[in-house]
Amino acid sequence: MSLADELLADLEEAGEEDGLYPGGEEGESDGEPGERQVDGGLEDIPEEMEVDYSSTESVTSIAKLRHSKPFAEIMDKISHYVGNQRKNSEVSGPVEADPEYRLIVAANNLTVEIDNELNIIHKFVRDKYSKRFPELESLVPNALDYIRTVKELGNNLEKCKNNETLQQILTNATIMVVSVTASTTQGTMLGDDELQRLEEACDMALELNQSKHRIYEYVESRMSFIAPNLSIIVGASTAAKIMGVAGGLTNLSKMPACNLMLLGAQRRTLSGFSSTSLLPHTGYIYHCDVVQTLPPDLRRKAARLVSAKCTLASRVDSFHESADGKVGYDLKEEIERKFDKWQEPPPVKQVKPLPAPLDGQRKKRGGRRYRKMKERLGLTEIRKHANRMTFAEIEDDAYQEDLGFSLGQLGKSGSGRVRQAQVNDSTKARISKSLQRTLQKQSMTYGGKSTVRDRSSGTSSSVAFTPLQGLEIVNPQAAEKKVAEANQKYFSNMAEFLKVKREKEDKV
C-alpha cells in the first residue's frame, strides 16, 4: 500500500469515528448520488463547470425551462395584465391576496431561473463550438455575446470580416482579434446536425433573454402599483426582489431594518475558492443603484440608511397610503441630502498664528570666568572660515570618500579684498576741523621730513631732487628762520612798542 492510500484510509476511519457519514458507509444513500441532502442544510448542487455537455445530443434535454408549463403560464398572465391596466383604488385588503401581486413575485423568481438556464445553454454551446473555433471562448467571455457570435459565424469563419451584424455585438478591437485568430485556428468543420443543434440552442438562449427583459419591464411598471413608495427609493427591480424574499409586503413591513438589509445575502462559498470577494452582511439593498453610486467606504453606511427608509416606505405601502408616492419622494430626498452631506469636503482649517514661545529664565551670568569659558568653547577663526561658503561658487570636496565635506574659505586663495570689521559711523570718534588743520600743519615740512621735526624713523632723508641741480641737500630749518625773522617784528616776545620809543627819542 502506498503512502497516499494509507492517508486516504486514515481519513476514512476518522470520518466514520466523527459521524461524518450517517446512515451507512460512504456513498450510500436512499436516492441518487447527486440528490443526497444533509440534515438541516442545503441540497448539494453540482457545479455548472463540472458538467460536460459535449456528448449531449440536444439542448432541450438539459434546458427544460423554455418549454415548461409554469414558464408559459407566467408569460401569458403577464401579457394579460399588460393589456389591462388597473387603478390603485382597485386594491383593497392585504396586498398578498391580490393575484397580480402573486404574479409579480412569481415572475421575479422566474428571472433567477432564466439566468441559470442561460448559463447551462452557454456551456452547451461552448462545448459544441469548441470543435470549430476553440479560441473564441477566451476572446469573447460574455455569455450572450458568445452565443450571438456563434449564431452569426456558424461554420464560415470568414464572416467576421466586414460584418455589420457582428459590429453591433462586439467592439472593433475584439472583431479584429477574432478575425486574426480565426485565420490560424486548428478547428474542424461542424456537421449539419451539429450546426442545427447549435442554432437551436442559440435561438433558445436569445428567446429566454428576451423573456427576461419583458419580465423586468412588467415588474418595473407594476411595482408602482403594488408598492409605489418602496419602488421610488430603491427601484422597481430591487423592490420586487426584497418583497419576494421576505414573503410579501406585509411580512416586509413587519421586518426590522437590520434584517431587511440582509435580504439576498450570499452565504455559500465554493470549495477551493477564495471568500475575500464575498462581502458579508450585504444583500439586495447594498447592490442597488442608489448605494452603488457612492464611494466604497460609504456604501455600508448608506445601505443601513436606505434599509431604514425602506422599512418606513413598506409600512406605508402595506396600508395603501400615499398611493401617489409622496412619502417615497420625501424619504428619497432625505437620503440624497445625507449622501451629499457625507461627501462634502471638510471645512478649511483656519490659519492661526503660532503662540508666543514660553521662554524659561535665561542665564545672565557674567564676569571674567564666564568670558573665558565662552572663548574656550566658541568657534575659532579657522572654524569660522571653514564654515563660510562663497556665494555662486562650486565647492571642492576635501576628501574623496566624504562627498559634500569642504573646507569653505579656509583653503582658498584670497580675492585681494581684506575682510574688515564694519565701522559704525554713528559711534565713530570725530575730530574738529581746527584740530585737523593743526595736525596737518605739524605734518607739513619743506623739502621733506627730518628726524628733528618728525617722529618718524631715522631713515628719513632731507635730500631733495630738483630739476636744476639734481640732488640737493636742503636745510629744512632755513626756510623757517626766514619766516621767524619776518614775524619777529610784530609777534616776537622781545619786540618793543615803537610809538613809545619814538616819543622818548623826541623828548631827548
Swiss-Prot record:
Site entry (Interaction with U4 snRNA and U4atac snRNA), positions: H281, R304, K309
Pfam families, alphabetized: Nop, Prp31_C
Feature: compositional bias, Acidic residues: 7-32
Domain (Nop): residue spans on this chain: 226-344
Cystine residue pairs: none
Entry similarity comment: Belongs to the PRP31 family.
Subunit details: Identified in the spliceosome B complex. Component of the U4/U6-U5 tri-snRNP complex. Component of some MLL1/MLL complex.
Protein name: U4/U6 small nuclear ribonucleoprotein Prp31
Organism taxonomic ancestry: Eukaryota, Metazoa, Chordata, Craniata, Vertebrata
